[in-house]
A protein has these predicted regions:
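Mobile cap/lid helix-loop segments that gate and shape the active-site cleft of serine hydrolases
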Residues: 3-5, 9-16, 146, 162-197, ...
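Short beta-strand element of the alpha/beta-hydrolase
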Residues: 39-47
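Catalytic nucleophile-loop/oxyanion-hole region of alpha/beta-hydrolase
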Residues: 54-56, 61-62, 76-114, 253-258
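Short beta-strand/loop motif that positions the catalytic acidic residue
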Residues: 201, 206-209, 213
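C-terminal catalytic histidine-bearing segment of alpha/beta-hydrolase fold enzymes
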Residues: 208, 218, 222-274
Length: 274
């Protein structure tokens, strides 16, 4: 933890931590390396409503699960757009682009195939991941070194109960306000809605949402699906009747949605991404 940053524990169960990081001052990644790397990597963007970044249930737990299956995982702690950064609403995308390029640049050291790097995002981190998978070519920061000559395009994208649309009738209100303000013009809403900005060479997508999600409406995943289909981009969509929001990899209990990591793994293997 750097000065001004804060980690808050939200769980009363020491065996089941649920920490968040607030006021991130320097973006960075936590790396989970498999005993025997299989060549695939996943950049993980946890959620937090653009208010904070979740550490455990959408970050470290997922990283450990992936590493146990031979996938090198990088959990991204990205800067938050409402905290005065010069990049404003592009700051998390800048951090995600930089992370993707650093992973690609360091592929030899990590035992990674540079063409097998995907991104996975949860909730507001789903917006970060979708923004990267659609806006990887946007120039949102000044190049720093040789890594920035590489592509930031992920080879696949998995969005788990994602924030997508910035339209007032569909958006998660807190994420929208912290990203683009309380009363943004329609052009700004569109510019920061990945479903309306899908390029022709976007990677394949995996979408997951519970229809009873009362935090981020399932319409967000459906809007992303429609945007991808309109551009001819491959997309696997998994909807579950029950699950709510924020269940991560291990907190859906006995509900059918608890099986989603295996569904993702099957999809990723079919894409050559796991």
């Amino acid at each position: 933890v750097l000065p001004d940053e804060q980690i808050v524990e939200r769980s009363a169960d020491p065996a089941r931590p649920d920490r968040i990081m607030q006021a991130i001052t320097a973006p960075r990644m936590a790396v989970f390396r498999p005993a025997t790397p299989g060549g695939a990597a996943v950049l993980i963007a946890p959620g937090g409503g653009y208010r904070h970044v979740v550490i455990d249930k959408e970050g470290f737990e997922m990283g450990r699960w992936l590493a146990a299956r031979g996938v090198t995982a990088f959990v991204l702690f990205y800067r938050l757009p409402h905290q005065g950064w010069a990049a404003g609403p592009d700051v998390a995308l800048a951090d995600a682009q930089r992370a993707a390029r650093l992973i690609r640049h360091g592929h030899t050291a990590y035992g990674i195939d540079p063409e097998r790097i995907s991104v996975m995002g949860f909730s507001a981190g789903g917006h970060v991941a979708a923004s990267l998978a659609t806006g990887y070519a946007r120039a949102v920061y000044a190049p720093l070194d040789a890594a920035d000559r590489l592509s930031a395009r992920p080879d696949g994208a998995a969005l788990i109960y994602p924030v997508i649309s910035m339209r007032a009738d569909l958006a998660h209100p807190g994420s929208r306000e912290r990203l683009i303000g309380a009363d943004p013009p329609p052009a700004l809403e569109l510019a920061y809605s990945p479903d309306g900005n899908v390029p022709a060479d976007a990677p394949p997508f995996f979408l997951l949402h519970a229809e009873d999600d009362d935090v981020v409406p399932v319409g967000n995943a459906m809007a992303m699906r429609e945007g991808l289909k309109a551009r001819g981009i491959a997309v696997d969509t998994h909807l579950y009747a029950a699950g709510g929001h924020g269940f991560g990899i291990s907190r859906a209990g006995s509900k059918p949605v608890a099986a989603w990591p295996e569904a993702w793994l099957a999809w990723a293997r079919a894409q050559g991404l796991a």
